[in-house]
């Protein structure tokens, strides 16, 4: 396994995992009702997909999901869909912790599928809720990741994972998303990437996260969703 900078032209395939919409962003339930939260999740996904799809070194984007509405959105913007075969029913005890385990398994399978079909491609697992992401940030992170092996961009809280990279065909993606994922990824051998990429690091799980994203500036779909909901500055909620 080489850790030297690779000389071949960079090519990356981005995987974006989205759980079933009823289980998504439950920590925003004090700010938005279920329908509004669903609309916001889809809007943030749309903005995230638009940004990464425009990065020159990205040759493919796949959304990993069991949710048909998410799959429809993904296909409508030109992304591939890899179906997570194990959706979780509302109220199921696996709704929280089990969901992450299922999506990690689906991400790993999707990464293997991509590498079987696209020889030599770098694989990235990216959060779906990055409404402030900029293409330049993501391009810089990709370049930094290509110095070899498996690497991670830790989120703005310092505990979660915004993006996980595998830039060596011999190194599995080995996703370990879920609460405290940054520590698990680092302990499993991923190296931290230290660039100043605030939009890439600001994933949205709480009202405070949404405030932070809006301070950076959000993408057009997210902006339109927030304006329609008259929640352009929901700083009063602060769910944890």
Swiss-Prot record:
Pathway, per record: Cofactor biosynthesis; coenzyme F420 biosynthesis
Q: Which GO terms describe its molecular function?
A: GTP binding; phospholactate guanylyltransferase activity
Q: Which InterPro entries match?
A: CofC, Nucleotide-diphossugar_trans
User: Could you tell me the EC number(s) of this protein?
Assistant: 2.7.7.105
SUPFAM superfamilies tied to this protein = Nucleotide-diphospho-sugar transferases (SSF53448)
Write the record's keywords in alphabetical order, separated by commas.
GTP-binding, Nucleotide-binding, Nucleotidyltransferase, Transferase
User: Gene3D superfamilies, alphabetically?
Assistant: Spore Coat Polysaccharide Biosynthesis Protein SpsA, Chain A
Binding residue positions for phosphoenolpyruvate: 161, 178, 181
Q: Which reaction does it catalyse?
A: phosphoenolpyruvate + GTP + H(+) = enolpyruvoyl-2-diphospho-5'-guanosine + diphosphate
Q: Could you provide one GO biological process annotation from this protein's UniProt record?
A: F420-0 metabolic process
Q: Does the keyword GTP-binding apply?
A: yes
Which top class of enzyme applies to this chain?
transferase
Q: Which HAMAP family match?
A: CofC
Which protein family is named in the record?
Answer: Belongs to the CofC family.
Described by its record, this protein's role is as follows: Guanylyltransferase that catalyzes the activation of phosphoenolpyruvate (PEP) as enolpyruvoyl-2-diphospho-5'-guanosine, via the condensation of PEP with GTP. It is involved in the biosynthesis of coenzyme F420, a hydride carrier cofactor.
Record NCBIfam families: F420_cofC
Its recorded name reads Phosphoenolpyruvate guanylyltransferase
Which species is listed as the source?
Rhodococcus opacus (strain B4)
Classification from the root reads:
Bacteria, Bacillati, Actinomycetota, Actinomycetes, Mycobacteriales
UniProt lists the gene as fbiD
């Amino acid at each position: 396994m080489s850790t030297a900078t690779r000389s071949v032209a960079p090519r990356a395939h981005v995987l974006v995992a989205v759980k079933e919409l009823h289980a998504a962003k439950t920590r925003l339930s004090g700010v938005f009702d279920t329908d509004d939260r669903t609309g916001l999740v889809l809007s943030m996904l749309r903005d995230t997909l638009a940004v990464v799809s425009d990065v020159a070194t990205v040759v493919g984007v796949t959304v990993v999901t069991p949710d048909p509405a998410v799959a429809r959105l993904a296909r409508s913007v030109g992304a591939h869909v890899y179906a997570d075969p194990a959706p979780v029913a509302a109220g199921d005890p696996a709704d929280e912790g089990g969901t992450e385990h299922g999506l990690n398994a689906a991400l790993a399978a999707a990464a293997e599928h991509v590498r079987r079909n696209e020889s030599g491609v770098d694989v990235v697992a990216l959060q779906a809720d990055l409404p402030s992401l900029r293409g330049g940030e993501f391009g810089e992170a990709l370049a930094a990741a290509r110095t070899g092996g498996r690497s991670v961009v830790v989120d703005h809280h310092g505990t979660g994972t915004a993006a996980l990279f595998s830039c060596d065909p011999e190194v599995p993606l080995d996703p370990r998303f879920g609460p405290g994922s940054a520590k698990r990824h680092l302990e499993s051998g991923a190296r931290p990437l230290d660039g100043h990429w605030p939009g890439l690091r600001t994933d949205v799980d709480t009202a405070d996260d949404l405030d932070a994203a809006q301070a950076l500036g959000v993408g057009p779909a997210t902006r339109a969703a927030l304006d329609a909901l008259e929640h352009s500055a929901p700083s009063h909620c602060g769910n944890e």
